[in-house]
């Protein structure tokens, strides 16, 4: 997935790009260590010296991606085009197409997405992007009549300033990596300071550092406060394992009065290891916290959650709940903010203009979330738009005639015209000019509410069709699969998909569904959908949702590498960061009760042969035991340790790079006959 993220989301949650440069001698190494600001000047020189077309294409892609990750989209686009012209392939064209969309060059983007679908052999894959580009063009044309006015806030810097929230006294607290930030060195991802919290009067031009008790030399950001200003929730990046990426956690700090000092911040107790928690937003009564998380048990990507305070609970909180499926998508939902009963958030999974777009929703009388509404242009653009903050406590007279002020506030965007990367923008919306009345002589009919689901069964397009470990280029419809739709309570419907892989059905209200797809020669798979929490919308009585079910081809007796399974040195215990991968494998086995698998463990060439053999056998057995603990029958599982006998990269041991050693250290599974 090549979605466009806000710079903060990408950069804050990683420590591989810390302020030291180690012994980086070339741009590729800097890129691999996520030190993108360091990589750019190195790669520019290396591209110019490239001796072959292949090398030039590879380096141009890394340079384009480094520019993209540091918020320099126009330069990124140039180098993605150079990479594609030098035979880098579909990845470069994909980055180029999304870059065109982000820069609002929609006609060119449509053509690029069309060519991309042809190149990977699946016009299906980018059909939504082509449609979205057409819709975004129309929204741009309609923008002047929408009554919105945006202007750059006076306190922005040449760096990144974003996600404002209100403090108790009406001042704004926002996140920035400007020169005033507390860190001594620069963050090599961005080339700027680490991120801190700042405070400013809304009309002022000179913000101040918020509080030394909360800001550290690392990354802090995106805060929210209770109405009294005595409780703050904010995000801090924390390293869980030495040498690994950091993970973002939400911290709580309190003070006894407005004049006293903050106590030491503590992480909220319900947060899991190796999962990011971002962008807290607090209800007016201080009892409900909304936030974003990439918990794998959600709907996909980053989802919006709510957590309720509970004084009777040992932790002080109820277990967080993921918000309904009509808000959350397989993409990313982020930056929630609240205004009375209205929830604003950003999404790149709902239909939008390019990057993150701002949406609004509200709770209906049945306490369900209404379908989200895209705020369109000019609130949204091809770039990332997020952090929508209406003016607190604004008591406006009834806006009844054209020109009357309807709402005002702030939002964040990295669109063209910003001073730096992300900027905070002030907005006003006024009543637009009246449209001529239209006569409607048709009799009024009772609304017929429907919840429709459109599903697609797909298979992966592999670079090498006979190699399950080769790169995935995309997906294409899979003809002939059978889909069983089962509602909670036992009611079932069965579909057989044709060449387009498509099926469609009407769903009931407040119902959980499981959709299971199967086809001979493929591993069965399922997808879940719930209509719980979806409100009826008189302006959109027929709501249509979409799911995709991807089936993997069965490669019998072929080892398939399991990603993200790592072990501590000289250990064979299953680490928490390996559990999601093994949990997914357990799901595959539950959905395919007729298969047996072998789990294999490989080491690199360093160390004694016998030691490596024993260690790898113990690691394979640990993986098997974990699956058994998840309810998989031991008779369906076999464990074998290969030691260093079957390297994936047969480099000469004394000359193997660290990357080659890492390729050889792997855990695999294969379906047995």
For every predicted segment, state its role.
Residues 347, 352, 592, 600-673:
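Periplasmic OmpA-like peptidoglycan-binding domain that tethers envelope proteins to the cell wall
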Residues 21, 33, 95, 102, ...:
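Short, conserved micro-motifs composed of acidic
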Residues 434-596, 657-658, 673:
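Periplasmic peptidoglycan-binding/tethering modules of Gram-negative envelope proteins
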């Amino acid at each position: 997935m090549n979605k466009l993220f806000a710079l903060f989301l990408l950069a804050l949650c990683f420590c591989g790009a810390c302020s030291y440069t180690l012994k980086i001698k070339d741009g590729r190494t800097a890129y691999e260590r996520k030190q993108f600001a360091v990589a750019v000047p190195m790669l520019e020189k290396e591209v110019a010296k490239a001796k072959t077309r292949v090398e030039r294409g590879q380096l141009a892609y890394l340079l384009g991606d480094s520019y993209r990750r540091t918020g320099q989209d126009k330069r990124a686009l140039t180098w993605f085009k150079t990479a594609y012209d030098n035979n880098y392939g579909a990845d470069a064209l994909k980055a180029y197409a999304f870059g065109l969309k982000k820069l609002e060059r929609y006609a060119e983007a449509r053509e690029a997405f069309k060519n991309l679908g042809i190149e990977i052999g699946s016009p299906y894959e980018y059909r939504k992007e082509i449609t979205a580009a057409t819709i975004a063009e129309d929204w741009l044309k309609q923008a002047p009549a929408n009554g919105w006015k945006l202007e750059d806030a006076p306190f922005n810097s040449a760096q990144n300033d974003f996600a404002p929230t209100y403090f108790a006294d009406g001042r704004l607290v926002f996140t920035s990596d400007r020169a005033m930030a507390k860190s001594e060195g620069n963050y090599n991802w961005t080339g700027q300071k680490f991120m801190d919290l700042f405070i400013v009067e809304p009309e002022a031009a000179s913000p101040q550092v918020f509080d030394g008790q909360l800001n550290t030399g690392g990354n802090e950001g995106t805060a929210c406060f209770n109405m009294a200003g005595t409780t703050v929730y904010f995000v801090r990046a924390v390293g869980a394992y030495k040498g690994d990426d950091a993970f973002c956690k939400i911290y709580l700090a309190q003070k006894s009065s407005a004049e006293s000092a903050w106590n030491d911040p503590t992480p909220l107790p319900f947060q899991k290891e190796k999962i990011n928690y971002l962008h807290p937003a607090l209800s007016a009564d201080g009892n409900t916290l909304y936030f974003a998380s990439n918990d794998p048990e959600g709907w996909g990507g980053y989802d919006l959650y709510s957590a309720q305070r509970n004084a009777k609970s040992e932790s002080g909180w109820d277990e967080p709940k993921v918000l309904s499926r009509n808000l959350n998508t397989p993409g990313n939902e982020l930056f929630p903010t609240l205004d009375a009963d209205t929830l604003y958030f950003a999404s790149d999974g709902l239909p939008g203009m390019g990057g993150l777009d701002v949406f609004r929703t509200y709770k209906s009388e049945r306490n369900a979330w209404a379908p989200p509404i895209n705020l369109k242009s000019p609130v949204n653009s091809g770039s990332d738009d997020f952090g929508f903050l209406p003016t607190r406590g604004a008591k406006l007279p009834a806006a009844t005639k054209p020109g009357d002020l309807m709402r005002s506030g702030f939002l964040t965007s990295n669109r063209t015209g910003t001073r730096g990367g992300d900027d905070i923008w002030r907005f006003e919306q006024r009543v637009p000019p009246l449209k001529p009345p239209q006569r409607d002589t048709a009799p009024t009919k009772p609304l017929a509410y429907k919840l429709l689901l459109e599903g697609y069964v797909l298979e992966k397009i592999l670079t090498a069709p006979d190699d399950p470990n080769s790169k995935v280029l995309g997906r294409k419809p899979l003809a002939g699969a059978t889909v069983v739709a089962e509602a909670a309570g036992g009611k079932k419907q069965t579909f057989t998909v044709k060449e387009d892989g498509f099926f469609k059905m009407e769903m009931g209200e407040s119902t959980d569904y499981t959709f299971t797809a199967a086809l001979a020669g493929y591993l069965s798979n399922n997808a879940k959908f719930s209509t719980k929490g979806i409100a009826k919308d008189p302006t959109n009585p027929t709501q249509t949702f979409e799911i995709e079910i991807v089936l993997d081809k069965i490669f019998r007796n072929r080892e398939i590498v399991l990603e993200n399974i790592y072990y501590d040195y000289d250990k064979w215990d299953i680490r928490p960061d390996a559990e999601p991968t093994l949990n997914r494998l357990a799901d595959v086995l539950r959905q395919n009760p007729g298969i047996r698998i072998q789990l294999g463990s490989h080491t690199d060439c360093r160390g004694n042969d016998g030691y490596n053999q024993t260690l790898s056998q113990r690691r394979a057995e640990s993986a098997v035991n974990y699956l058994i603990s998840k309810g998989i029958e031991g008779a369906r599982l076999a464990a074998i340790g290969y030691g260093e006998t079957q390297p994936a990269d047969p480099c000469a041991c004394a000359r193997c790079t660290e990357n080659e050693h890492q390729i050889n250290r792997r855990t695999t599974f294969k379906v047995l006959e």
